[in-house]
Structure formats: C-alpha cells, structure tokens
Amino acid sequence: MRGLLLAGALALPASVFAHPAHQSYGLNRRTVDLNAFRLKSLAKYVNATETVIEAPSSFAPFKPQSYVEVATQHVKMIAPDATFRVVDDHYVGDNGVAHVHFRQTANGLDIDNADFNVNVGKDGKVFSYGNSFYTGQIPSSAALTKRDFSDPVTALKGTTNTLQLPITVDSASSESTEEKESYVFKGVSGTVSDPKAKLVYFVKDDGTLALAWRVETDIDSNWLLTYIDAKSGEEIHGVVDYVAEADYQVYAWGINDPTEGERTVIKDPWDSVASEFTWISDGSTNYTTSRGNNGIAQSNPSGGSSYLNNYRPSSSSLSFKYPYSVSSSPPSSYIDASIIQLFYTANIYHDLLYTLGFTEKAGNFEYNTNGQGGLGNDYVILNAQDGSGTNNANFATPPDGQPGRMRMYVWTESTPYRDGSFEAGIVIHEYTHGLSNRLTGGPANSNCLNALESGGMGEGWSDFMATAIRLKPGDKRSTDYTMGEWASNRAGGIRQYPYSTSLSTNPLTYTSVNSLNAVHAIGTVWASMLYEVLWNLIDKHGKNDAPKPTLRDGVPTDGKYLAMKLVMDGMALQPCNPNFVQARDAILDADTALTGGENQCEIWTAFAKRGLGAGAKYSSRNRVGSTEVPSGVC
C-alpha cells in the first residue's frame, strides 16, 4: 500500500488515495520502502517434459514413504556436494503427485533462501523439480567456532532501527531455545508475540553467502522475517512479509456484492467432508457464535492484535440473522451482519478449496486436523471492520501450524461508507493469499512468494480465483469483470484494466511486466492470462455453475473448476519464488499429472495469446514475449 511491501493487501490505484486513508499501525506509519528488501528469485524449474530421470525400480509404484527416498536421491544426484535436510511437510496431493521439500545447510545452519522441491509422480519417478541451491564456496566454520558475529539483541536493535519498526527494544534480552543458535526475546513492547532470532546463512543479491540473523517480528499489519548481517549487525540482506494485504442470513455464494442479489437465509451450509465438525465446532467444543474449526470472526474496531475476547454475535438457537442495508450508517450499526457474512464467505471458500485439494496435509487452515495430516491450531482469524486501516484488506500467512490473519476494512469512497466484508471477491482474494503461500514451497515455508514477480503472481492468483467464482450462468468469453468495484465505488474497479479475453479491452501481455514494479500491477497481467486459460477450458468442457465441482476420478468435469484445480496443483509443483515462465510450466505439468495432458492445447493457446508462448524468456528487466504454440500440441 502506497509503495510499501504489504503482501496480501488488496491495493488500489494511486487515484483512490486522493483522500488518504487513516492508518494506525505498523509500517504504514513509516517511510521505509520494503520493496527494496524483497528477496530475489533464484530458482530454476525443470518441468515434466525436461525431466527424464528414472527412479529406482524398487520404488515403482512407491510405498507411502518411499517417494521421500526417490526425491532425496534425486537431490543428491543434482547437487552431489550439497548438504541439506528434508523439510517435514511432504505429502501426496489428491492428483497422486508427491511433494517433497529440502533446505540446504552449511556448517549445521540453514541457508534460508536455498530450497529444492521434488515432485514425484504416481509411477514412482521424478515428475518435475525446482532448485535454488547455492553452488558457490561454503565459508569456513571458523566464524561460528570463534563466535565472530553479533549477538541476537544487536540484530534485533539493528532491524528495528533500520526498518523503523514501531516497537521498543531498549530493555530487550534474549533467551536461547532448544534449536541451534535460536533465541526468543523478552522485554520488547509493541509486538503481537515475543520476537525471535535464528542464525542462518543467506544468499545475497551478488551471489555470495552471508551469515545472518533471521529476526521475526509480528507487529500486526506486518509480520516480518528480516535477514540482517550477523557481522555488522546493521546491513539488511532481505525482508519477507507474511502479511498479504446453522441459519445464516447472508449474500449467498456466487453473489459478489449487494448489486448482484439479495441476502437469503441458508441452513447448515457446510460440506460434511471438508468441515467434518461443521463450521461451529472444533471437535471438542461446540460454539453458538462465529467460531469453529476453520475460522473465528469478530469485530476489531481498535485494530489491535487481540481477538479471542472481541465481540462476536451469539445465538443459542444457531439463528444468525441480523439486519443490514447498503444505506445503513455508520458501519458499526450492522457489525453483526458483517461478522456473519465474513464468517460465511471464508468458511464456504475453505470447503471449496478442500474439495479441490487444499487439505490438511497440504497445509490448510484448521484448528483441529483430526489426524488427517498437517499441523493444527491454525484457523483463520477474521477481523471485520478492522480499525487499523480503511479502503483495503490484508492477509498474513505464517507457516503451517500458526493462524492466518485476515483484516477487512471499511471503505470510505462512498456515502454511506461500505464494508469490504460484503464484497465476496475481496474476502476470496485475501484468503487466496493463504492458499498460494501454503502451497508454493510447501506448508512449512511461507517465504516463497516474496520476489517481485512471484509476489505479483500471488496477487494475480487471488484476483483469478475471485473472478472465476464470480462467473454467472449466462456469462460467455466476452464477459468482462472488474475487481473491487462495489467497495471502492469505482466503475472500473481497482485494477488498470478489467479481466477480459479481448485484447482491445485489456491489452496486457507478458512484456507489459517489463515496465511494472508493483505487485498488484504485475498480478493483473498474470490474472489476465489465467482468465484466458479459464475460458479456453470452459469452451472445451462447459461451465458448472454449482457451488462445488463434480469430480470424476478426482478431475473436475467442467472447465471452470478444472482451471481452478490446475492453478492450485501448479502452485504445489512450482519452485520457491517462481517467475511467469516457471508458473506456466507448472500449470502445464499439473494438467499432465491430472488428465494426462488432455488440455495442453487450450492452456498453451491461452498463454501464447498474451505473450507467454513457447519462446517466451524471463529476465528481470527485459522479458521476451512469444505467441508461439509448440508444434504438435494442437
């Protein structure tokens, strides 16, 4: 927002800020531009066509754990001199592809931005992989032995001073944890939880390896991992931000905002497979309010970090019906309806994503995973009418096992003001940040959409999912859609162009990214490409307008849900911090894994139309476009 790195924020064009929004917390109070500290994209992706590695015959078909051995042997073959560890978040997706993630180590410490992901097919062979391992010289362990580096408190103070964090560290002290060179800080004020520090290595922009402290500070509007040089205690090498800006009377699923329909009363809307405890239980406690296994929704007028004791409506009869009118004012007068709408939209999206493969083992957001894999205790904290800002929204995605946090704001660009919780596309956009961050790089690593281009694609995936869900029964490929039109009170929405298959209406192509340096603008290009994929698949397979897909052998039978499924499967295949070309290849690979490549022509044609054809080349400053479709594909 305003040029600051607020990953997951919805964002607006500059013109929307003619009347600046009030900001009360976090980085919005400062002038430090965190974009300067974004991590660089280091990974390469070897797609399924390029991967011709045979797994040992004894592993085909693989047993429940043998895919880890296949992946490990592959890493040893590609990087024979590297030391590494297996990240404990591997799983087999519902398309039959296993995902295993590795972290490179040096002298017993993690190289925090050196990752390797291996995707193993159902036949027990390596399907594709991504690699950002460091290949340069590993430094001597002498610095560690002699402890020739700054102490963690110095690192915390250096981080706070350089980034101008609104926290007080004068009385900070550090306590060691059970992990090697890992500390938690006490005596710090202004943070949601005690800051942490861990000694790691970090691959710098110039390709060299630096010893660094990874300092974690959650200050509500920003949840930061700061890599500060362990010797100087001042130079910052990179920053990751986890924040990416019964009977229910609601706008039903598929109604994007109040201009598209009326509120209705919906009874027991949960999916009993995706939400086996319903939406208002966590398996041990049954609630009579907007709290359950998938989310907890409440009012947050102060904009603070506390939520458990915040106000939420309660009904002993489980009748969550509260008045709302678009002409009502102030927004606090309809807070009950706002909380229930937010709770409904987030929960029903959870259930849809579960059906499409975002399950417990894939790192979804649930308090109780009920023995289905993954880590629990991480429902989504859903703050309605959050007082920490206006005219926006954001989502914080920490690693699996820690709650996601969505902040929905009031929009002040109309009279009366409008509440973002009543525009489903905004809620879906924010929740999708949690989806894309958990799937890319694995559930245990939330650092994999932090480069400029990958962060842009994060915004694009969020817009795409919101738009796909918004489609109406009578829509055709000539139908255009905007983002945030109702909440912002802007006829053209909050993006540069509407999403359209017309190059006249929306002329964005791959090379448009060369002139862009903001994630939301880059995301509009990516989502425009995915909108082309969506309609090519709908033209081939038809469109299911029901709130859930029909699956045949795990494959959606229609084009809309198939496109959403392939996009999600591609997230799990692609490397950490991918670029457009790699993400395109991952979607093509997802189709190969799911359908045997039945839709390669439609996918290639869609990407080629907007310049991401077979000859497209990535460069951070001079991307080369291509409208070429590979021969023999169509």
Swiss-Prot record:
Its EC number is 3.4.24.-. The record marks 470 as: Important for proper folding of the protein and catalytic activity. The gene is mep. The keyword Metal-binding applies. This is Extracellular metalloproteinase mep. Ca(2+) 2 binds at residues 437-438, 440, 442, 445. Ca(2+) 1 binds at residues 364, 375, 378, 400. Changing residue 482 to A: In strain: Isolate 13.
